[in-house]
Regions:
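A short, conserved, highly charged catalytic patch centered on acidic carboxylates
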Residues: 1-136, 144
Length: 147
């Protein structure tokens, strides 16, 4: 399997770079981002579940995403965080696997074969049976996001 590291210019559709930024929306995003970073800094000693519930999920919720913490899977496994179209939908659009910063289980651009990637692939296979709306899988250490 081969992975290609893309920069922001290659990843985003050129349309979005040309689109006018609405100041009010930018201010909301900036405020949410500052609160997210403050929560991360004050919670460095906490575990992944705490960081997902008290930093990442509130950040995404402030940006109007419908988040679900610890979505149950077959067996004992749980998706750390997921995003759906609405709060009652079982159709997940985004799966998020979180690892603590500097975790050996986290993916990097030089070390792709990691536990974080294996878990997201497992969750994808389990979800595709009943959910056809999955669009993205995100692996994060709360500072870096691999899509």
């Amino acid at each position: 399997m081969h992975f290609t590291l893309l920069n922001e210019k290659d990843f985003f559709n050129p349309y979005y770079r040309k689109k006018q930024i609405i100041q009010n929306e930018f201010d909301i995003f900036n405020k949410a981002l500052m609160q997210y970073l403050e929560r991360l800094e004050s919670s460095q000693s906490e575990n992944e579940d705490y960081l997902v519930a008290n930093a990442l999920s509130p950040f995404l919720t402030m940006l109007n995403f419908k988040t679900h913490i610890k979505t149950k899977q077959k067996g004992k496994s749980e998706i750390d965080l997921s995003i759906s179209k609405d709060e009652f939908s079982k159709d997940l659009e985004v799966l998020i696997e979180a690892k603590k910063p500097n975790s050996k289980e986290f993916i990097t651009h030089t070390k792709v074969n990691s536990k974080a990637l294996h878990e997201t692939i497992l969750y994808y296979f389990r979800n595709r049976e009943y959910s056809f709306s999955l669009k993205f899988i995100i692996i994060t250490d709360f500072y870096k996001f691999y899509i």
